[in-house]
Design a protein with these regions (language model features):
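Parallel beta-helix/beta-solenoid
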Residues: 58, 79-101, 112-124, 172-188, ...
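Right-handed parallel beta-helix
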Residues: 58-59, 175-186, 204-215, 226-241, ...
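Ser/Thr/Gly-rich low-complexity blocks that favor extended beta-strand/coil architectures
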Residues: 91-95, 99-159
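Extracellular beta-strand-rich, repetitive "passenger/adhesive" scaffolds
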Residues: 1-3, 11, 28-39, 57-63, ...
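N-terminal extracellular ligand-recognition/capping segment immediately after the signal peptide
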Residues: 23, 30-76, 124-137, 154-164, ...
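Short glycine/acidic-rich loop motifs that flank beta-strands on beta-rich extracellular proteins
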Residues: 44-46, 64-68, 188-196, 216-222, ...
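Acidic Gly/Asp/Thr-rich repetitive segments characteristic of extracellular carbohydrate-active
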Residues: 6-37, 41, 110-115
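Extracellular beta-strand solenoid repeats
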Residues: 5, 35, 41, 47, ...
Length: 272
């Protein structure tokens, strides 16, 4: 329990893939810090829904030699994809009243029964295109006002007219993950063999520090529906693709709130 070194599971270098050891440690909720004391290689793309854990690579190199092929056009097919779980409680409804800009009280049916501090993906119907929405964020309910209104941890950035269709979906986010101190080396080639270390979805307070990457395909760190996080002292040099849409980034942040990106650099890349 507590802190466990992956060498206890027979991982003494990149010759033996570290996938099974990582899966076993992540499956044990009593392990809160996983330490890698040697260079390591992974051959599978992992998805985790468990939080409250730190992955510390202690400055060693992470590779993905022989990794399983990625799905087409799937930037979330990282080596480590941490994700919360969307629930079955979905509420779709037209606004009965206009919503004011810079207002944190939101209309929602059955508000009196919504648990305090529960998390919801809150979005509005698009008026043009698919993603042109005034809101699509992961929000926390901080107060029940009455049977049809709650307060959330966000002040609305645009006014909405009555009749606009809102969708609230309950989410159990992944919380308090930290990945740190990694030298990542991706693969040459294209999308199938391309590799990148990290993706976070429906994530709260999930931080990344001191990840230095080269030769990635999709963003080194992809975030969607994240909030209250820090990305710091990370870098990317020489990604293998910068022309295809979405490639060649150090970090991409979609529908995110309250994040800090600081002391990060890129060289010969598409974007920070």
């Amino acid at each position: 329990s507590g802190t466990v070194d992956a060498r206890c599971f027979g991982v003494f270098g990149p010759d033996v893939p570290a996938d099974d050891a990582l899966d076993a440690l992540m499956a044990d909720g009593s392990v809160t810090r996983i330490v890698f004391g040697t260079d390591v290689n992974f051959t599978r793309r992992h998805t985790f829904t468990r939080g409250h854990v730190t992955l510390d690579f202690t400055g060693h190199t992470v590779t993905a030699q022989g990794v399983e092929h990625a799905k087409h056009n799937d930037p979330f097919g990282a080596l480590f994809h941490f994700t919360g779980v969307p629930g079955d409680d979905v509420r779709t409804f037209p606004l009965a009243q206009p919503m004011r800009e810079l207002y944190d009280v939101f209309e929602v049916p059955g508000a009196g029964g919504i648990p305090l501090y529960s998390w919801w993906q809150v979005s509005v119907n698009s008026l043009a295109g698919r993603e042109e929405k005034e809101i699509d964020k992961l929000l926390c309910v901080t107060e029940r006002i009455d049977e049809s209104h709650v307060r959330v941890n966000y002040k609305m950035g645009w006014p909405l007219d009555a009749g606009r269709v809102m969708t609230w979906r309950r989410v159990e986010p992944i919380e308090r993950v930290c990945v740190q101190d990694m030298e990542f080396r991706g693969n040459e080639g294209g999308e199938e063999t391309g590799a990148q270390p990290l993706a976070f979805e429906y994530a709260v307070r999930c931080d990344v520090r001191d990840v230095r990457a080269r030769h990635t395909y999709w963003p080194v760190l992809l975030r969607r529906h994240n909030t209250e996080y820090v990305t710091e002292r990370c870098s990317l040099a020489n990604p293998i693709e910068v022309v295809v849409g979405g490639t060649g980034y150090l970090t991409q942040q979609i529908h995110c709130l309250y994040g800090k990106v600081r002391d990060c650099t890129t060289s010969n890349a598409r974007h920070l």
